[in-house]
Amino acid sequence: MWDRVLAAAEASPVCTEAVARTFVTSMAGFFVAYHALALSVFRGGAKEQLNKRSWILTTLSALCMTLASLPYVYQLLRHGFHWGHVDPYRESLAEPMSIFFVAYLVSDLLWGSVYYRHLINFTSGWVHHSAYVLMVLYWLHRGWSHAFMAAAVMEIPTWVMGIGRMSPKLRSFRAFTTTFLSTRIVFHAALIVSLSTEAGRGIGGESLSWQPFISSICVFPMHVFWAYKLVRSNMRRHKKRLEERAAASCAEAASGVPLRDPAKSEAEREGRARAHRVLAAAVRKLWSTAPEAWRKAYAEELLSLIHI
């Protein structure tokens, strides 16, 4: 029994010198990046600075993973989410970046335990990171690393949030909401459907497997729940803004002095309109590139939800 286990481990793409080198190099890179920024741009003993430092590794990882996912996202969109036409780039991109992500998860727990232990939540920190380390290594072992890298585009909202946390002037709830809904809801739903097809179940190159589909669909309810909370939060924020504007209008009418800059109000309206157009264009692109059978199935599912 142990001989078979050892033989399987030796044959696994996880147990190679290249993977070990990538992991060590990535760990060293995160160490240098964190300490370089923590001791310069984000130095200081204030609580606000500590909160900013806790987002250094997450923001850096999210940016790198998003950029690395683009070749796979492009191929999926171009070929209607057909995995048979997606070049995996396993050795040159998918496997190294998967290990890079594992190194981030380990680094965040390691350096977080040293520098910002009280900011590491048990569920979203220890449980989440540990579970993803195991999942990524298993997907790498099964030859599914390129599918994981395609899903890494869902790190865009994490990067947007990280930038906003480290630089409050750049914080944008609109940008976060747009990227979250377009990647973790729309793109994720299309990814789930694609992994249920024969080509999707054969992404490992050997036997067909439902495991990638099951893994992706298990995470989806969490994204839907987060999206629900996000929409509710935006609705409350929008209601508050309307109340503030109504109060400002009353004060303006009473005093006869304009309290808001008309040019600024117009710029805000144009910004909201641009965000709506970007989101609508992304949804239309995903919908138009999906096969007809998928669109029909998704439409039927939406109708069934409406009638519940």
Kindly give the residue locations of the regions a language model identified.
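Conserved small/polar residues in nucleotide/adenosyl-binding loops
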Residues: 306-308
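Aromatic- and histidine-enriched alpha-helix N-cap/loop-to-helix transition segments
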Residues: 58, 151, 219-222
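Multipass alpha-helical transmembrane domains of eukaryotic endomembrane proteins
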Residues: 94-211, 230-237
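N-terminal signal-anchor/initial transmembrane insertion module
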Residues: 1-116, 228-237, 241
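C-terminal transmembrane module of eukaryotic multi-pass membrane proteins
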Residues: 166-301
